[in-house]
Amino acid sequence: MLVFVTVGSTRFDALVDAALSEPVLSTLRDLGYGQLILQRGNSVIESERFNEESCTIQRHGVDIETWKFKPSIQAECEQADLIISHAGSGTILDVLRLGKPLIVVPNPTLLDNHQEELASALQILGHLKATSIQDLASTIASFEPRDIIPFPPFDGSKFSKLVDEEMGFI
């Protein structure tokens, strides 16, 4: 099985370090995830080899492919059995619309902690699981994708109706 981890375009060294840590990789391996793809953006990793544009290694029984950026992460999201992500709104909505199991880790270093608010709201609605860097391994271990409530499909007619009502067309 495949796990895709993405930090987006903002540096999130702590999530990259956690994803490559022994506790997280061992937990993933024990749950049957043998492959991890890591989009690390501009994050800095201690191992110099990881700081190349892309590389592939094996660590703690998990095959790891890592790279900085691609024009689109759609293919990786579609292939993944589990997605672990920063809590950016664009990434969250893209993943939820695909119906993929999603664990989000808000980046606490960002201004006004807006990622935490979004992650918390969507977790309360049951659409994803939110966690911290410190609890990532235990969250993965206890995560039950079948308990996730599917995100409702986009319905553009609601917005159109609202505009029509406000404009007095209806």
Located regions from the model:
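Donor-nucleotide binding loops and adjacent catalytic segments primarily
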Residues: M1-Q79
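Short acidic-hydrophobic, aromatic-tinged amphipathic segments that line or gate anion-handling sites
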Residues: E65-K68, L128-T139
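A donor-sugar binding/catalytic signature common to diverse glycosyltransferases
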Residues: I73-D112
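CheY-like receiver
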Residues: E76-Q79, S138-F143, E166
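Acidic/polar active-site rim loop that often engages polyanionic ligands
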Residues: G99-L102, A121, S142-P145
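Active-site-proximal loop->helix
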Residues: N107-A130
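C-terminal amphipathic helix plus adjacent low-complexity
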Residues: F143-I170
